[in-house]
């Protein structure tokens, strides 16, 4: 979801809020506003649209979480041929990759985790109705270890459940891609859950730690992104196992193994090999690398040889100018020199 679209949603809700103040009819106005907004959001499945209409306060948070996932995806792949861009259908989760590749696996995992993270944070901050701090982490005292639950523990289970209900609702086709997407959604949420942190505060006389009050907090989303990038690098190719009677996809097993071994719950899985992402290709969703910045001297993925797929690169020269060697003179002005530097950038042909 683009930032301008998110702002549009916010301003529409704001306008309906002003209308409510003037008319004094909250329920009907909110319902009308939710219907208008939810019908305008591209790519929503019927169940997602129903959730949007019943929980209009949550749709902005969902959008923030989806955008957080997209931003993290772009950060993790900023130096690769594929930079988290696609030519697929526009949805609240960005443009979808048409190929069931390891890149698609990452995008599903990171956006599912992003929605769970954003919803959990909004609940802890009191920005969503029907949720708050984790009630199960209140009042317990561990006398042996000298600590008790206190403060506001993030209710990550609520965030995960909400992400599961909303994000997974777009999987309506009964095929192998559905099983792949659902597995990767769950893997992203599981990585988030496993990285929850315990923070404690000491209580006692003169700085001693007679007792501790502890609570759980969300990890930084960058940490989740790094972990999922590692999962992407070790992604597992799978194939579908079909039921004997209806021949419908039943579960996924690791490909090239004789046994029916299922992937681990935190594995990212894919069913199709990745394209090379060198050229624009509507069939795969690849946008190609033409015009991408590259590093002429790097031997890595961001190097011009790799990034440009052997097509060569263009050199662009420009002069960078800035204020430098600034000194304060009494009294009272600052005098600076003007420095300049000739700079080159390289883009793929």
Curated annotation (Swiss-Prot):
Residues covalently joined to lipid (O-palmitoleoyl serine): 206
UniProt PTM: Palmitoleoylation is required for efficient binding to frizzled receptors. Depalmitoleoylation leads to Wnt signaling pathway inhibition.
Family membership: Belongs to the Wnt family.
UniProt cross-references to InterPro entries, sorted A to Z: Wnt, Wnt7, Wnt_C, Wnt_CS
Subcellular location: Secreted, Extracellular space, Extracellular matrix; Secreted
Keywords tagged on the record: Developmental protein, Disulfide bond, Extracellular matrix, Glycoprotein, Lipoprotein, Secreted, Signal, Wnt signaling pathway
Stated name of the protein: Protein Wnt-7b
